[in-house]
C-alpha cells in the first residue's frame, strides 16, 4: 500500500517536472519577463501577506486578555508535548534504522 503512494507521488512529480521544463523552454525566448519561480514566489508572498493581515485584523477585533492567556498556555503545553513525542519518534526511528549492533 505504501508503494502505491510513492508511485503516485513519483508520477505527479515527473509530470510536474516535464511541465516546468516545457514552460522553461518556452520562456527562453522571453528573457525580460520574470521567471516562473519569481512569479510563484511573489504570488505566495502576496497570499501570505493577505492572510497575515486578515488574521491580525481578526485578532485585534476579538482580543480578550483571558482568552489570550488560555491560548498561550495551551500553545506552550502542546509544543512541549509535541517536542517530547518528536524526540521519542526520532529515537525509535534511529534505533530502527541503526538496528542491533
From Swiss-Prot:
Record's comment on post-translational modification: Proapolipoprotein C-II is synthesized as a sialic acid containing glycoprotein which is subsequently desialylated prior to its proteolytic processing. Proapolipoprotein C-II undergoes proteolytic cleavage of its N-terminal hexapeptide to generate apolipoprotein C-II. In bovine, proapolipoprotein C-II was found to be the minor form whereas apolipoprotein C-II was found to be the major form in plasma.
Signal peptide (UniProt feature, chain positions): 1-26
Lineage top rank: taxon: Eukaryota
Cellular localization per UniProt: Secreted
Record keywords, A-Z: Chylomicron, Glycoprotein, HDL, LDL, Lipid degradation, Lipid metabolism, Lipid transport, Secreted, Sialic acid, Signal, Transport, VLDL
One Pfam family linked to the record: Apo-CII
Chain spans, region Lipoprotein lipase cofactor: 78-101
Main location: secreted
Iron in keyword set: no
Molecular-function GO terms, alphabetical: phospholipase activator activity; phospholipase binding
A cellular component term, taken from the record's GO annotations: very-low-density lipoprotein particle
InterPro entries: Apo-CII (IPR008019), ApoC-II_dom_sf (IPR023121)
Function summary: Component of chylomicrons, very low-density lipoproteins (VLDL), low-density lipoproteins (LDL), and high-density lipoproteins (HDL) in plasma. Plays an important role in lipoprotein metabolism as an activator of lipoprotein lipase. Both proapolipoprotein C-II and apolipoprotein C-II can activate lipoprotein lipase.
Family statement drawn from the similarity comment of this UniProt entry: Belongs to the apolipoprotein C2 family.
Protein name: Apolipoprotein C-II
Natural source organism: Camelus dromedarius
